[in-house]
Structures are given as C-alpha cells and as structure tokens.
C-alpha cells in the first residue's frame, strides 16, 4: 500500500473486485444480520484464457441458477474522468492463429530466389482479410448478423461521450481511425465488429542482422463480435474465405471463441445497479472525498468493448447481466507489474454492492 493505492498483480482485474463482493456480504451480515436477497457466487479462474470449461459448468449446473434476477459480473471501475460506469453487455471474440510453412528448416536467405518464403505467403493471406483503408473486413458474410442498436442504446452513447482527447493522449496517437469523433466514434467502438492482427512472428527478429529465410510464419487474428454474430460461424467464414482465395495451404487454429452478449439497459437489474451507484458515489461527494465524482454522472452504457463469457448466463440461462460495480480506474495498469487500485475506490465498491443488495431485496 503506497500513497493511497494498493499495488498487486490482479488487484484491479480482478481479485479486488472479487473481494469487494465477498466483503459486501460480510458487511451486511455483521451490520444487519440476514441478507436482503438470496445470493449465489460462481468463481471461475480461467477467464484470461477464454473460460474453456465454463460452458460445461453452466450446462451441468444451470438449473440451479435459473430464476435469479440476474448476474453481477466481475469487472468494474471508473473512466479517465473519475466517473463510475455500468455496462450491460460485452463483445464476443473469435481468436485464430494462421500458420504458413515452407522448408523443413530455416535456411540461408540467398536461397530466396528459388525457395518460397512463408512470411510473404502469410502477408498475402492477411491482406486478403481486410480493406485497411476502409477499415472493413473482407470475409464474405462477416457483417450479415450484425444487429443495429436500438434508440435507447444510441441515446446512452449520446449522453455519455468518450473522453477522446484523454484517450488519444494516453495512447500517444494523433487521431482515431478515419478521424472519427463524437457519436460516430462511440458507435464504432461498441456497435461494430473488428478484425485485428494481434501479432506476427517469423524468422529472425533480434538485434543486428541474420540472413535467414524462415521455415514458418504465424499470425494471431482477433475478431471482436457484436450481437447477433456467433464466434464459431465467424471462424467458419474465415476458413472458407481463405480456401476460396487460394490459401488452402494456410493452417488455421481457433484459440478462443466467445459469443457477444447484450442485456437490456432498461431492465430491473441495470436500473438497480444504476440507482445504487448514484447513491454510493453521491455520498462520496457529500463527504468531500478526493476520489468522488458527482453521483448523477454515473455512466450507463449498452456494452463494453472487451469480452467475457457473459453469453453463457444471458443467452443460455436467460439471466440479465451487468458489470461495473468494481474498484478499477483508468490508471490501474491492468496486467502490468504496477497494477493498482485506490483504497478509497475499493471501499466505495464494497459500499456499492451493499446498496445493490438493498435495492434488490
């Protein structure tokens, strides 16, 4: 603990948020006795690798969860302006690895005149996937299932604009793609799918020179999906795209496949989460907290741009889901060695869960 912050790996994503839920229950039991509502906890430790066993769990134990008001998800925090946020959904993901092979070993680059280079072959395959200038995926049928946002969802984006200048400054970029801003920028971020190269590996990448013709080239591709796209369908479409364009030799392995999820922003759980957030952070303002922000400025957004297995609970079990009741913040440095949360934010998150239990009781 240093300068009002707790530093620890996973403290923001997401061990701290897990403990806020447990300590909120502890606070209620110690202060009032019996809980105002029934609670069930699902602890799952594989989210960072795509939750490969969670579907098996929900199929086996889903009947025990059905009938609940909904699911309070694991994440949450404040934006760069210090505003708490409530989100009712996530994007999905189709993550694949493409592999091109040539010789059975790395060989001297002088042989490039007569030996095919898998790195160039991979570049050609990648180029076929996307029109970079238009920022549009070229896989046939990629956008077919994209569901347009409703009027309420669009209104929420209009009411809660992104902190564009802070985002650009923080990332060190002069402008967003196509110089987007305002509602167009927020809509692109949350309502449109993506097709992104996450990494490319081949040959020699160390210091200085090494004249090598690589035997293999690999690329990892990440497609973030929106309702009503399906991850397995997108994977099939990518494979078909490669085959139809003469890249049958390019191997493809699906590394992660999760569907998007969207709960109603005007549902009972979302509104209870919003009301309890406004009350909690409004109290911080009244108390003169240095970490407070006006309670009425709590952001309610349709979904986040990230991914989690929320669809297993919403689409398959019929449970509304919300996230946002957490202790994170814009400078938490998630996944970095100096990951941190503010002590005051941590206890505010505990208080938020306590109030939410009261709202649902």
Predicted regions and their residues:
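Acidic, glycine-rich active-site loops and adjacent beta-strand->loop/helix elements
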Residues: 5, 39-51, 74-79, 102-105, ...
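Acidic/histidine-rich catalytic neighborhood of metal-dependent amide-processing enzymes
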Residues: 10-89
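Zn-dependent metallopeptidase/amidohydrolase metal-coordination segment
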Residues: 99-101, 106, 122, 191, ...
């Amino acid at each position: 603990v240093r300068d009002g912050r707790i530093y620890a790996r996973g403290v923001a994503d997401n061990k701290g948020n897990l403990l806020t839920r447990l300590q909120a229950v502890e606070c209620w039991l110690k202060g009032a006795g019996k809980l105002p509502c029934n609670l069930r906890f699902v602890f799952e430790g594989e989210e960072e690798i795509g939750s490969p066993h969670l579907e098996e769990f929900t199929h086996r134990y889903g009947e025990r969860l059905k009938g609940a008001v909904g699911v309070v998800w694991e994440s949450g925090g404040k934006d760069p302006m210090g505003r708490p946020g409530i989100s009712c959904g996530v994007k999905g993901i189709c993550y694949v690895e493409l592999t091109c092979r040539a010789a059975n070993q790395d060989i001297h680059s002088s042989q490039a005149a007569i030996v095919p280079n898998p790195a160039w072959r991979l570049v050609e395959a990648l180029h076929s996937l996307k029109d970079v200038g238009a920022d549009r995926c070229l896989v046939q049928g990629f956008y077919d299932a994209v569901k347009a946002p409703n009027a309420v969802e669009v209104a929420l984006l209009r009411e809660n604009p992104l902190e564009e200048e802070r985002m650009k400054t923080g990332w060190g970029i002069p402008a967003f793609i196509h110089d987007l801003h305002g509602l167009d920028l927020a809509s692109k971020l949350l309502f449109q799918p993506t097709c992104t190269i996450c990494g490319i590996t081949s040959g020699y990448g160390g210091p200085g020179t090494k004249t090598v013709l690589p035997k293999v080239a690999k690329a990892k591709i990440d497609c973030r999906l929106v309702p009503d796209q399906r991850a397995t369908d997108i994977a099939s479409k990518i494979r078909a795209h490669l085959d139809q364009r003469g890249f049958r030799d390019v191997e493809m392995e699906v590394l992660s496949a999760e569907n998007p999820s969207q709960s109603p922003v005007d549902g009972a759980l979302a509104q209870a989460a919003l009301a309890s957030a406004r009350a909690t952070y409004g109290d911080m303002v009244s108390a003169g907290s240095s970490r407070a922000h006006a309670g009425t400025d709590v952001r309610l957004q349709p979904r986040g741009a990230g991914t989690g297995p929320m669809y297993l609970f919403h689409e398959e079990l019929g449970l509304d889901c919300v996230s946002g009741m957490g202790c994170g913040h814009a400078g938490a440095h998630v996944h970095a060695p100096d990951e941190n949360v503010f002590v005051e934010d941590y206890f505010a998150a505990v208080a938020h869960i306590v109030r939410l239990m009261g709202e649902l009781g």
